[in-house]
């Protein structure tokens, strides 16, 4: 069975939800929620426990970020699902180097749409976006590999207008430069991309006038 990262995040959210409600040890809670086929998948198991442990070990710092950007909302008044989705996303931002921050935010929003109220996705998006902008401006994001995907490069690089490897030509799509035409006319014109020499005027043939 192939399990997606979104499904792993959903399971992590369920574990954290039950952990908060039941007040039991996280290992016991996780054992009753995470399916055996996920535990048998080394990559899936590693990712889900990275998320869960990152949240639990850093929950005070994570909750501080949430509370800072939640206008007039106390943590204990927030929906438990929303709160744990935000905890997961912030944990990924700060402690999982290989996850792009915007992916973490988007995943939390989409899962909120499925499991929580109609207004939850906007609420989650607002707090996570504000948190992301804050930690990015302070330079506390430490990403590597795939985690660098949506972060700005240190130096702006200008794309080469003449790349060494041209893009693959789509099939069955006519080349706009193969047979150029004048606008609103079927008369072909000279291809401006063909050859390096400037067009030469036609040579006139001189004839002697008869006396």
Curated annotation (Swiss-Prot):
UniProt function note: Involved in transcription antitermination. Required for transcription of ribosomal RNA (rRNA) genes. Binds specifically to the boxA antiterminator sequence of the ribosomal RNA (rrn) operons.
GO BP, one annotated term: transcription antitermination
TM stretches of this protein: none
Family, similarity comment: Belongs to the NusB family.
GO molecular function, one term: RNA binding
Record-linked PANTHER family: ANTITERMINATION NUSB DOMAIN-CONTAINING PROTEIN, N UTILIZATION SUBSTANCE PROTEIN B-RELATED
Protein name: Transcription antitermination protein NusB
Keywords attached to this entry: RNA-binding, Transcription, Transcription antitermination, Transcription regulation
InterPro entries: NusB-like_sf, NusB_fam, NusB_RsmB_TIM44
Listed Gene3D superfamilies: NusB-like
Amino acid composition bias (Polar residues), ranges on this chain: 175-188
